[in-house]
Amino acid sequence: MYYKYDITYSNDVANEKEYLINLIDSPGHVDFSSEVTAALRVTDGALVVVDTVEGVSVQTETVLRQAMQEKIRPVLMVNKIDRSILELKLDGEAMYQSFLRVIDMANVVIATYVSEDMGEIQVDPSVGNVAFGSGKDQWAFTLAKFSRLYSTKFGIAIDKMMAKLWGDNYYDAAGKKWRTDGEAEDGKPLRRAFAQFIMDPICKLCQAIIDGNVEQYTKMLKILGLELSQ
């Protein structure tokens, strides 16, 4: 797979902008653990895909354990969020809590089996090693994508913006302040930044596509620098 790094919204100064990536699809079932081990021994990293509705399964734990044994650093893909939006019809806060449970469960497994010489390898959206998306519909994002969009608006560096978009961070528009207590200066409850600035636009985009509102979804896709395939 050829990948060219999108520097449109980035201030990164890394030397490499183009990559050739070889992906090995290994079985996740516990009965094929030897095949997973063989794949891990010829790779530089592991992309662990977890169903956000089903959560971390026995198979997921087995794969993470094997990655730790082979000293392979994992990254996490929280998959099937289309089900959360269209099937379960969860709001942004409920989806955040669902994603958080998956990430926390994965980190418990990692912490259980990691060796000290591997250093800090916990998966955390705010550092860029967790993606969210829909394999079925062929789209995904990391917090970095939205951080690049919002960093200019809020006058915050991209890495700091990523931290604002995860965890207990809320924006008080009236007071023009970021808060961590979920309550505005006037005592009114605030919406979590991840729900407000990421999931709300995604849910609105999905609904606009379903409703056939071409004008609305075309405008939203343009802001994201995306095109909708036929």
Q: What residue ranges belong to the model's regions?
A:
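Structural and coupling elements of P-loop NTPases
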Residues: 1-230
